[in-house]
C-alpha cells in the first residue's frame, strides 16, 4: 500500500491498541483492511490521534474493535470489519452502537455501509436490529453523524438485489474504504 494508506490503517491500529484492556489480539497495521489516502504524513497521523482523544469515544471502552463479519444479502456474500462496537446494558436491555471512524477530509460516507454493519452485528449477536444503532465519527472534526433510519434486511435485499453493476457497496470485494 501507499505510505498514506498505510498511515490510515495505522490510525485504526492505534485506536485498537489504545484500548489494551480488551482481550482481542492486536493486529499489525498491514493486517488491517482499508486505509485513508488523505492522511498526508506522520504529523497528520498525530493530529488524527489528538483529535480522536477529544471525542466522546476516547473516554468509552469499546466492546469490540475491528470486529469481522460475513453476511449474505441478496445472494451475495459481504465481508468486512466494523471499526468499533460499544455495548450498553441498562439492566433491562442491552443495546449496541457501531462506530465507523472516518479519517478523510471529506464527508462522503454512505449510510448503506452502516446499515450493512448494523444488520451483520444484529444477526451475529442474535439481537433485533432495533437494538443496534450506528454512527460515523469524522475524526478530524469530532463530528458524529447518526443516519436514521437505517434500512433493515428487506430494504437492503431490495437495494442490493437491484444493483445492475454487480458490485456490493462497502464490501471488501468492492474496495470498502475508511
Where do the PLM segments sit?
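Nuclease catalytic cores
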Residues: 1-82, 86-87, 177-178
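Short, surface-exposed helix-loop/turn micro-motifs enriched in polar/charged residues
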Residues: 3, 57, 109, 126-129
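Non-catalytic protein-protein interaction segments used by genome-maintenance enzymes to assemble
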Residues: 5, 9, 69-124
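Residue-level signal for well-ordered alpha-helical scaffold segments within enzymatic catalytic domains
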Residues: 13, 17, 116-119, 141
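Short acidic (Asp/Glu) and glycine-rich catalytic loops that position anionic groups and cofactors
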Residues: 16, 23-32, 94-99, 137-142
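Beta-sheet entry/capping signal
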Residues: 62, 95-97, 133
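Metal-dependent nuclease catalytic regions and adjoining charged, substrate-binding loops involved
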Residues: 121-178
Amino acid at each position: 500500500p501507499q505510505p498514506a494508506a498505510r498511515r490510515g490503517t495505522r490510525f485504526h491500529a492505534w485506536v485498537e491498541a489504545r484500548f489494551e484492556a480488551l482481550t482481542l489480539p492486536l493486529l499489525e497495521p498491514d493486517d488491517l483492511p482499508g486505509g485513508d489516502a488523505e492522511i498526508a504524513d506522520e504529523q497528520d497521523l498525530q493530529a488524527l490521534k489528538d483529535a480522536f482523544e477529544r471525542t466522546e469515544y476516547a473516554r468509552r471502552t469499546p466492546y469490540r474493535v475491528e470486529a469481522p463479519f460475513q453476511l449474505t444479502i441478496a445472494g451475495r456474500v459481504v465481508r468486512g470489519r466494523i471499526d468499533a462496537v460499544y455495548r450498553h446494558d441498562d439492566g433491562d436491555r442491552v443495546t449496541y452502537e457501531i462506530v465507523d471512524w472516518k479519517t478523510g477530509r471529506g464527508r462522503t460516507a454512505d449510510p448503506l455501509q452502516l446499515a450493512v454493519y448494523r444488520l451483520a452485528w444484529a444477526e451475529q449477536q442474535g439481537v433485533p436490529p432495533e437494538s443496534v444503532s450506528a454512527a460515523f465519527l469524522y475524526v478530524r472534526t469530532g463530528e458524529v453523524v447518526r443516519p436514521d433510519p437505517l434500512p433493515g434486511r428487506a430494504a437492503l435485499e431490495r437495494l442490493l438485489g437491484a444493483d445492475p453493476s454487480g458490485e456490493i457497496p462497502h464490501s471488501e470485494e468492492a474496495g470498502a474504504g475508511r
